[in-house]
């Protein structure tokens, strides 16, 4: 893997250079503005390109050192792109309303996450039958409300090491909390925003869907690059994991998974894997999966097959990558 490449042409085609109407500008962004066209400020992409590369490098370096990245984008245009990019790269996200204190009052947020996990476990188990229909409906509503706000960070396990933000005006509370805690901020900063306090500033359009999708894709790929570098540092052969199966191996054998009848000794805490709750861990166990090494040995097709069975196919690659890393650490 390597840091994702991009060109100025890609930025132009995505509309990254279009700022806001000139009368809505923030004078502190003057240094990053190329000019005005049809009363619209044009962002200087000759500055955006190196600054975006710098931000991607910082994100990759953070993950390579074992750090966590939190994607933040609660505006309508960013919600899906932020969630998809975070899931694809086994990271974390907030794409609904930012709860005040998400970072600065993590202890309280952790309590809400525990409540969310409890509700998920109760509603997915036979214990749910002990409640009346009305009580189950109330529990489901509470779970859904908590999941909207906390679902993207319930597996984070602690404060992030860097946050990536779309629209610094809308996410000003998140940025202030990160600054108070000394957490670096990489952010897309439009011509109507204040660049003060942004660690890795990237001047560009923060409203266009294509531009947001491009930013999120590049950041996700930078994270994956960092994960690959981290695995390389602990001696995992990334190239070997990507090699095709030997030709003399029957195709059916390549996708057939044989689980264990029970754990061999103490089972591993599978909740350490991204997106795995207590309920998902139980489903893993039902499939005969109790240890990280079992996942680390899976080929891509089998991993995706298991992901489909658990209802989380997009997490399969991240599970295998994390399992390999945890297995290497244990050795």
Swiss-Prot record:
It comes from the Bacteria. PROSITE patterns: RIBOSOMAL_S2_1, RIBOSOMAL_S2_2. Pfam families: Ribosomal_S2. The keyword Ribosomal protein applies. Keywords: Ribonucleoprotein, Ribosomal protein. Belongs to the universal ribosomal protein uS2 family. HAMAP family: Ribosomal_uS2_B (MF_00291_B). This is Small ribosomal subunit protein uS2. It comes from Rhodopseudomonas palustris (strain ATCC BAA-98 / CGA009). The lineage of its organism: Bacteria, Pseudomonadati, Pseudomonadota, Alphaproteobacteria, Hyphomicrobiales.
